[in-house]
Amino acid sequence: MEERAQHCLSRLLDNSALKQQELPIHRLYFTARRVLFVFFATGIFCLCMGIILILSARSTQEIEINYTRICANCAKLRENASNFDKECTCSIPFYLSGKMMVGEIQETRLTLH
């Protein structure tokens, strides 16, 4: 019986730091102070981003161009599937009433192709 106990002990892993390594456990400690700080910091960040987005959206200009009648020949050309390889171009010139900032370039006249 003693031989059997020795035989079982010899099959166990070595008791070394390499074989049986204990890693420290990392736990997050949430305190009320930390949670409230993160909550309010996130709220202030979102508020600032919202203000920036609202201010940048105010300077947006929208132009609506109706090209239904002007480019009607292209629509008729595409109704027939055999005309898939034929090219159709439609050009509509338009003008902006005021100056528009595009990066560092100011343009007062644009053309849509």
Curated annotation (Swiss-Prot):
Transmembrane segments: 35-55
UniProt-annotated location(s): Membrane
Keyword field contains Cell wall biogenesis/degradation: no
Gene Ontology cellular component terms for the protein in this record: membrane
Signal sequence bounds: none
Glycosylation site positions: N66
Membrane topology: Single-pass membrane protein
Keyword Glycoprotein: yes
Residue numbers on the Cytoplasmic membrane side: 1-34
Disulfide bonds: none
Keywords: Glycoprotein, Membrane, Transmembrane, Transmembrane helix
UniProt main location, coarse: membrane
UniProt cross-references to InterPro entries, sorted A to Z: CDC50/LEM3_fam (IPR005045)
Segments in the Extracellular topological domain: 56-113
Tissue expression pattern: Specifically expressed in testis.
Family recorded in the similarity comment: Belongs to the CDC50/LEM3 family.
Protein name from the UniProt record: Cell cycle control protein 50C
